[in-house]
A protein has these predicted regions:
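Short, small/polar residue-rich loop motifs at catalytic or cofactor-binding pockets
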Residues: 23-26, 49
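Asp-based phosphoryl-transfer active-site loop
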Residues: 25-41
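Active-site phosphate-binding/coordination module
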Residues: 44-137
Length: 198
């Protein structure tokens, strides 16, 4: 859920990045994580790790762009001895841009806060639709684990959201599309992943 001001910032940041990279002739690769860089079942990147590290050693910048939280992406960096810039929560925040160029900030927020999103949701979504929605953050850890497919020790990182509310929609496709329209008219967007919506 990026605000209009967020869209302007997002465009400005990427225009600046590409201008700077063009001047320095650097290569940047933007990649998703789950199901792309990471195995969709094990969340490991063993199969591509050697090639991945070879690219980094050649000075190629790799920027994960993920629905994952800042906490999850920091953990990914730490667990794999990496220091990557990254885009968290479906473009809601950009981290470590100063690693790409010293004139860029460390962190840019281009979305509403979780509380702002919750307030818009409460004010604009009917009870009928609310009854079709499971809020992942409100579930017990075991149920969160079943839905997200993550080990228990990773759940606490996955639910540490700053700019999105993970949900599971329990209605028909027609109802889901209507729900999307209501959110859009309320100034919010929703992303559908392999397991949940944000």
């Amino acid at each position: 859920p990026i605000s209009p001001r967020g869209h302007e910032l997002f465009s400005w940041v990427f225009m600046l990045i590409f201008t700077l990279m063009k001047q320095k002739k650097q290569i940047i690769i933007f990649t998703d994580l789950d199901g792309s860089l990471l195995d969709k079942d094990t969340f490991e990147f063993n199969e591509i790790e050697d090639y991945f590290r070879e690219l980094i050693s050649k000075g190629i910048k790799i920027i994960p762009n993920s629905s994952k939280t800042e906490a999850e992406l920091l953990d990914f960096n730490e667990q794999n001895n990496l220091d990557l810039s990254f885009i968290a929560e479906n473009g809601s925040s950009i981290h470590g841009l100063n690693k790409i160029h010293q004139n860029l900030p460390d962190k840019i927020i281009i979305s509403r806060t979780k509380d702002e999103i919750q307030n818009i949701y409460e004010s604009n979504i009917s009870l009928d639709f609310k009854n079709k929605i499971t809020h992942i953050l409100e579930l017990e850890r075991e149920k969160q684990q079943k839905i997200l497919g993550l080990p228990l020790d990773k759940i606490k990182l996955a639910i540490k959201r700053d700019h999105s509310l993970p949900i599971k929609f329990n209605g028909t496709e027609i109802e889901k599309n209507e729900f999307r329209k209501i959110l859009k008219n309320s100034g919010l967007t929703i992303q559908t992943g392999g397991r949940i919506m944000n």
